[in-house]
């Protein structure tokens, strides 16, 4: 029974295996026949892959030709970036060139200004040397020696005399400012009265020098001193007979010297009164001089007009002019008396006040005139429409 079943199974297996073997043999025979016929057999999978690769290459080649696709965009962007960089570089170069040109122009203008400034300095130095030479010649000829000497030679040197006076006064003013600065420092430092007294005496002696200087200047050119052209404009506005009014200066000092004793107060009041009276007398004398001088000149002119050009008329004319010249000599006396009044007022003030009060008074006087000079500078520097 078992043997019968095994034979049956083998028969069934053979039945199924024979067809398979036959099919395999047939296939092998077919392959051999195809090989002989020269037909290429390819797998469908192999065909599909080859087709995809060829299409990809073609597309890539096409994109490269037309500039499309991602590669073309990247190349375009790269070219745009390069162009922008070049443009920025060009603009930067242009700005640099403009900046260099501006710097060269500024340097050129600076050199021109420097050259003009140097030329101005050279010109000023030349003028200063010329003035120093004029001053030296004036000193050698015996005029305007502040320490004393004869000023009679001043009459023969009109222009040089006034120039020398202006230079000497400017120098005196600088030295005076140094004296005042020393006095101010000493007063603020609360120095002893003995030390302070030496500085006060130095300032008073310096005032003596300027009055001697003006005396010689008056002999050289009385009208120059009278006009006050050696002073600042604001100082000339308050000027009286070639200088300050003593009575007005005492009014300025009165409010800065307190407290004063009764005796000092009375002395200042009496000094102010006497100064005012002397000023009034000199002013009246000046008015009378102007009147008589004007009348003399009118008489001389009338003589020439009425008498023609005869010898007698010329003689009369010259006589009238000689009288007028003599009256101008009186003008010099008025200026000297006015300076003498100013000088004596300062000396009297010094005697009335204590050392510290006198020091303060000298500072007040100096500051007053300094403010006038500062006002003049501001006025001259004002903008003009």
From Swiss-Prot:
Q: Where is this region: Basic motif?
A: 95-115
Q: Where is this region: Disordered?
A: 62-113
Q: Name one Pfam family in it.
A: DOG1
Keywords, in A-Z order: DNA-binding, Nucleus, Plant defense, Transcription, Transcription regulation
Family matches, as InterPro entries? bZIP (IPR004827), bZIP_sf (IPR046347), TGA_domain (IPR025422)
Quote the Gene3D superfamilies the UniProt record gives.
1.20.5.170
**Disulfide bond sites:** none
Is Transcription tagged as a keyword? yes
One GO cellular-component annotation of the UniProt record comes to:
nucleus
Query: Is the keyword Nuclease assigned to this protein?
Result: no
- Kindly report the protein's main subcellular placement as a broad class: nucleus
Q: Which residues cross the membrane?
A: none
Superkingdom of this protein's organism: Eukaryota
Locate the region Leucine-zipper. 121-135
Q: What is this protein's function? A: Transcriptional regulator involved in defense response.
Which protein family is it in? Belongs to the bZIP family.
What is the protein named? Answer: Transcription factor TGAL3
Question: What is the source species?
Answer: Oryza sativa subsp. japonica
Q: What is the lineage of its organism?
A: Eukaryota, Viridiplantae, Streptophyta, Embryophyta, Tracheophyta
